[in-house]
Design a protein with these regions (language model features):
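Conserved N-terminal phosphate-binding loop of PLP-dependent enzymes in the Aspartate aminotransferase
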Residues: 2-458
Length: 458
């Protein structure tokens, strides 16, 4: 029986690793990284992955070391490395065939592409399901968001009369510290803490409206969090009134990832949905990072109890390619188009991975595993209040803050160099945990033990 089917009762680790006195990178990794530096300027992790040595939650390196991975390739890993289900002969044959024959999707339709479309349509956000629901695939998360915005602009244009529409400007409303991608439309609804990504592009498309994101701070009182939420909603209401008829759409993440693992109250999203409906503004959710099941549902939007369905949801990462869900089809054909429309080999792999996820019931247990993880993190915060606070999240996507940015950077360094534990930062002072769905209870317990050891060294 595969380990992931054992109800999460043990860890994929053979044993708790001893202190890693040999710092990364190892000599083989260092040589390979040095060679890459001749070809491209890249900000690399200090190791080179050996895919054959990876297993479950563990990365293997070309130097023969093992790293406990809680970054999940920037939240793009759906199931554990080298799962036995990914070596079934019939699947491997389909995968190789797709890899050897890259086709433009879906224009040159294949059975493999159709199966992907059938799968993503079947698992669509429940709140959006209707006979007219349409899906479209592109190559990345940024392209998914970009095309979602094009879809909303198209709806906005048609609502204003199509060809006879006035020249009145159009805008998007978005939130502080949002990250939606690195294409031009997406960058103009993005506010990164590192200005390098946006400095030459932000504002290139003028007129967009930025408002605060009411991130919950679990270290503060419920009333203070509710007050923050009310203030933001009042601002949104005022802006939609002030710029009536000009706002094409609202773009929002259920959890702000790069912006600091920021989580809002469900009531915020519910009232945002009501405001969008009241002002006849289209609402689009960026689930590039959250979709796939780690929050306890395939789509986190289904956990928000929205009074009105969003017009669109964009996703990618764990889905292999970029996907746009549209509540209703576009009237203007050809607005969304791409040569490749996503990679066929990624489509084939995702279909197989989703079969594994459903067979092993991994989404259903993500909530209970998330409760175990959150409880353990709260315990760390109670034991180390001078270091850790504001534990928050949904399902397995949990995070916490350090009391200053220097501590966060130090924790990441100590974790990797001394415990072979890979963590991922978020915002200025936070850590976001992004495990794959094959994570077991033992993996969670091991993470908490390693974090305890790291915090004692700070």
């Amino acid at each position: 029986m595969d380990r992931a089917a054992k109800n999460g009762l043990e860890s994929s680790a053979k044993e708790i690793p001893a202190l890693n006195r040999d710092v990364f990178p190892g000599p083989v990794s260092a040589a390979m990284m040095e060679e890459l530096g001749r070809y491209v300027i890249a900000d690399l992790y200090p190791f080179v992955v050996d895919l054959a040595r990876c297993e479950g939650m563990w990365l293997g390196t070309v130097d023969g070391r093992r790293i406990f991975d809680w970054a999940g390739y920037y939240a793009s890993k759906l199931i554990g490395h080298n799962h036995p289900g990914l070596y079934e002969p019939e699947y491997v044959q389909r995968l190789v065939r797709a890899a050897n024959n890259k086709t433009p999707n879906p224009d040159f339709l294949t059975a493999e592409c159709l199966e992907y479309y059938r799968t993503i349509h079947r698992i669509a956000p429940r709140c959006m399901r209707n006979p007219k629901l349409e899906v479209y695939t592109v190559n990345s998360g940024a392209e998914a968001v970009e095309n979602m915005m094009k879809y909303l602009i198209n709806l906005f244009h048609l609502r204003r009369g199509g060809k006879s529409a006035s020249a009145q400007p159009g805008r998007f409303l978005y939130f502080q510290q949002a990250f939606h991608g690195r294409t031009i439309f997406a960058l103009n609804v993005t506010e990164t803490l590192d200005p390098v990504a946006t400095k030459d592009f932000h504002g290139f498309i003028p007129g967009n409206l930025q408002v605060p994101f009411p991130g919950v701070n679990t270290s503060e009182s419920p009333e203070k969090n509710r007050s923050r939420t009310r203030e933001v909603l009042e601002t949104v209401d005022w802006l939609l009134t002030r710029f009536a008829g000009e706002v094409a759409g609202i773009i929002v993440e259920p959890i702000q990832g790069a912006g600091g693992h920021r989580v809002a109250e469900p009531e915020f999203f519910q009232d945002l949905s009501r405001l969008a409906h009241k002002h006849q503004v289209f609402l689009g959710f960026d689930e590039v990072q959250t979709a796939g099941g780690p929050t306890g549902e395939i789509f986190m939007v289904d956990q928000l109890d929205l009074p009105y369905p969003p017009q669109a949801v964009a996703t990618a990462k764990k889905f292999g390619v970029g996907v746009i869900y549209m509540l209703h089809p576009m009237e203007d054909k050809g607005v969304l188009d791409s040569t490749w429309g996503g990679g066929l080999v990624d489509m084939v792999r995702f279909v197989q991975e989703m079969k594994i996820v459903e067979r092993e019931g991994l989404v259903a247990v993500a909530r209970t595993k998330g409760e175990r993880l959150a409880a353990g993190l709260r315990g760390l915060a109670e034991r180390h209040p001078e270091l850790v606070f504001n534990v928050r999240g949904q399902g397995l996507y949990q995070g916490f803050s350090l009391t200053n940015s220097a501590l966060r950077l130090r924790l990441e360094e100590v974790a990797l160099q001394e415990e072979a534990l890979l963590l991922m930062g978020a915002g200025v002072d936070s850590i976001r945990l992004r495990p794959n769905l094959s994570t077991m209870d033992g993996d969670i317990d091991l993470l908490l033990e390693l974090l305890e050891r790291c915090l004692r060294r700070l």
